[in-house]
């Protein structure tokens, strides 16, 4: 199996449950002009809701037992702080929302729900325009744990995995804006470098060590989400799709 695949026809979730591939470019494109218009409105109206990846900004929202993890995770990160907006949550919420597994129990009791992914809803303040159009066009179950993420200049994420073997998770990225200085790196030594093109949609293997960095002046902007297995199978079977 190739590390990077552009023709996923014939693949299934079952066939991808291994650690021999990094990411897949789907035959799917999106209207970046429309989505960037939506993104600019979201940022203009909701900076107060951004979860910012820096120790002082994250700590107030993170459960106590993960405080050392935050310090460790960010301590080796020499890049600037990424910003993230959570687009789905079990209740309507207007403030900062961390990743559910990190969330402070007192501030976010709903995050303790073991079925939080199934019980989450789209937050009304984000669910409109080009994003809603895209959401409604993709197969049911595509957009779970959906977040808007951006990297400014010299901003990134250090090497990490999102799950540990034998666990397995496929994540989807919709690229709204990227440029020649924005790259993902995969592998134990981050030896495999990839550029994800604006307007394209990708699946990637979160169990493979990976990191990201943006070296350009422009923001690197994406939507990322965890499609369910049936949605992944549907996405892999698509011949061609343009949204917007």
Show the residue positions of the predicted features.
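Non-heme Fe(II)/2-oxoglutarate
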Residues: 1-137
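A short glycine-rich, His/Asp/Glu-containing loop-to-beta-strand
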Residues: 135-155
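A short beta-loop-beta micro-motif enriched in histidine and acidic residues
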Residues: 143-144, 157-171, 189
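Short, conserved beta-strand element in jelly-roll/cupin
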Residues: 150-152, 166-182
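A short hydrophobic beta-strand segment most commonly corresponding to one strand
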Residues: 170-175, 201-203, 216-235
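A short beta-strand-loop-beta hairpin characteristic of the jelly-roll/cupin
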Residues: 175-197
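Conserved metal-binding segment of the jelly-roll/cupin
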Residues: 193-209
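Asparagine-centered strand-capping/turn motif at beta-strand->loop junctions
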Residues: 210-215
